[in-house]
Each structure stands twice: as structure tokens, then as C-alpha cells.
A protein has these predicted regions:
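Conserved PLP-enzyme active-site core in the AAT-like
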Residues: 164-265
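PLP-dependent aspartate aminotransferase-fold enzymes
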Residues: 107-198, 205
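Short beta-strands and strand-loop turn motifs
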Residues: 7, 66-69, 198-204
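Conserved A3 ("GATE") glycine/threonine-rich loop of ANL adenylate-forming enzymes
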Residues: 33-35, 128-129, 153-158, 240, ...
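Active-site and channel-lining beta-strand-loop segments
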Residues: 46-67
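Glycine-rich loop-to-alpha-helix module at the N-terminal edge of alpha/beta enzyme cores
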Residues: 64-141
């Protein structure tokens, strides 16, 4: 019965969205899976969007939808927001890529440091890259190899821990602990006291079900990590929007390195 209903739903979807299907079939000739973002993969095929305005999106078949997703928190201001468009046009009218230092880089860096209470900031191309460089920095700085992450965690396209460590993850030496289980996490840290380079944690699991971490859990895990000389990394790519200075600040927990992303980019 379930398979029958699912097949009917797929058929109804296909009947309603023929132009998206045509786009999908054409895109698959050049793009693996027909697109470049794995999270968008679903049966029978993803919708293709032609435009967006405010809180709505319009697909290539002319259907308009209210956007409750906001590009996975990256689109907090909505689509085609006038102030953003004006600044983009102004920036593009001055240059596109100078291949050198631009004064706006330091201005944005100062604003980031002031807002989030950080010492310095390094800009990257994505949240995935920010976490990659944070982990690499910890490995180089400590001379150790292991990195503690948590079940259900997601730190980018090559750092996925919904069911253990995904086979396509970047080749770090990961050890896992249950999220929000302080005793279990402290035991893992103790067991790897001489080999642990870093602890990487989201203050709230994003892809793992929007489960908030407790202040007690986060602070005790970071304290234990510091006691053995490991680097404390907070992944705030999806959570920094929860407070003016990020979610960790709301919880009263300080990281050594913090990764930001989504709407900030």
C-alpha cells in the first residue's frame, strides 16, 4: 500500500512539473545527479527554480511557493532583497576580482570580530572549507591526529556523521561520541588524551534534527579538551543566527576556533 501511494505521489509530481523534469534530464548530461548539491537529491527529481522574490520562489513550470527553508539558513533576508541587490551592483561596478587585497575585506573582518567577540577572522569559500581548515589547523598545531565529533553531526559535505563516519568523509582520524552525553564524551576524551587534536561540535545539531546542546555538556567537553591540550572548535555555520554574537555566546561557552557561514557569506 505504501509503495503504491508513493508511486502515485511521484507520478502526480511528474505530471505537475514537466519543465523541471526536462531541466533535470538535460542537466544530467553534464552534472553528476543533475545538480551540484547532494542535499537536493530526491525522487523522482528536484524542482528547478527560475526566480525568487521576498519570501517566494517560482519554478520553471510557473508554480510559486512560499519559501520556509531560506536556503538552509543562508537566505535570511529573502530573495532579491533590495538593499542586498543595490550593494552587489555597486560592488560589481567597481571590480569583480582584483587578485589582491581589497579594503572591504578588513572592514568586514573588523565587523565580524566586534560582533562575535573573536580575535581575528580568516575568510573562506564555504562552511565546509572553514571547518576543514579549522581541523587541519588543530592537527598541525598539536601534532596529533584524532578529532572528536558527535553522532548526528554535520560539518559540511565531507564531514557527515548521521550513521557513524560517512565513507565519503575527508580522511581525518575521527572518533565519535553521543551528542549531549557528557559522561560518554568525557570518557572518549580521556581514552584519547595523548592523540586527540580537536573536539568539533555544533551548539545545536543542524542536520541531526535541530537538537540543542546543553550549556553543561558543551562547557564540560571543552574544559576536558583543553585539559589535554586539544583544540576546541565550535561549528556555528548554521547556529550563529540564534544570537547577535552566536549561539555559543548565549550558552556562555567559548571556543578556540569558530566556523561561521550560511547567511554571513
Amino acid at each position: 500500500m505504501l509503495n503504491t501511494q508513493l508511486a502515485k505521489a511521484h507520478g502526480d509530481f511528474a505530471d505537475r512539473n514537466p519543465q523541471s523534469r526536462r531541466h533535470y534530464d538535460e542537466a544530467r548530461k553534464f552534472l553528476p545527479g543533475g545538480q551540484t548539491r547532494s542535499v537536493l537529491t530526491h525522487a523522482p527529481y528536484p524542482l528547478a527554480f527560475a526566480s525568487g522574490q521576498g519570501a517566494t520562489l517560482t519554478d520553471v513550470d510557473g508554480h510559486t511557493y512560499i519559501d520556509f527553508l531560506g536556503d538552509y539558513t543562508a537566505g535570511l533576508l529573502g530573495h532579491s532583497e533590495r538593499r542586498v541587490l543595490d550593494r552587489v551592483v555597486l560592488a560589481l561596478s567597481r571590480n569583480t576580482s582584483v587578485g589582491g587585497v581589497h579594503p572591504a575585506e578588513a572592514t568586514l573582518g573588523r565587523l565580524m570580530c566586534e560582533r562575535f567577540g573573536i580575535d581575528r577572522v580568516r575568510f573562506t569559500n564555504s562552511g565546509t572549507e572553514a571547518n576543514l581548515l579549522a581541523m587541519t589547523t588543530a592537527v598541525v598545531a598539536t601534532g596529533r591526529k584524532k578529532i572528536l565529533v558527535f553522532e548526528g553531526g554535520y560539518h559540511g559535505s565531507v564531514f557527515y556523521f548521521a550513521n557513524g563516519s560517512a565513507k565519503w568523509n575527508a580522511p581525518f582520524d575521527f572518533v565519535l561520541a553521543p551528542y549531549n552525553d557528557t559522561a560518554a564524551a568525557l570518557q572518549v576524551i580521556s581514552d584519547n588524551a595523548t592523540t586527540l587534536a580537536a573536539v568539533v561540535v555544533e551548539p545545536m545539531l543542524g542536520s541531526g534534527g535541530c537538537i540543542p546542546g546543553s550549556s553543561d555538556f558543551l562547557s564540560k567537553v571543552f574544559d576536558a579538551a583543553r585539559n589535554i591540550g586539544a583544540v576546541c572548535i565550535a561549528d556555528e555555520v548554521m547556529t550563529s543566527r540564534h544570537g547577535r554574537s552566536g549561539m555559543m555566546q548565549l550558552l556562555g561557552v567559548e571556543a578556540d576556533i569558530t566556523a561561521f557561514g550560511k547567511y554571513i557569506g
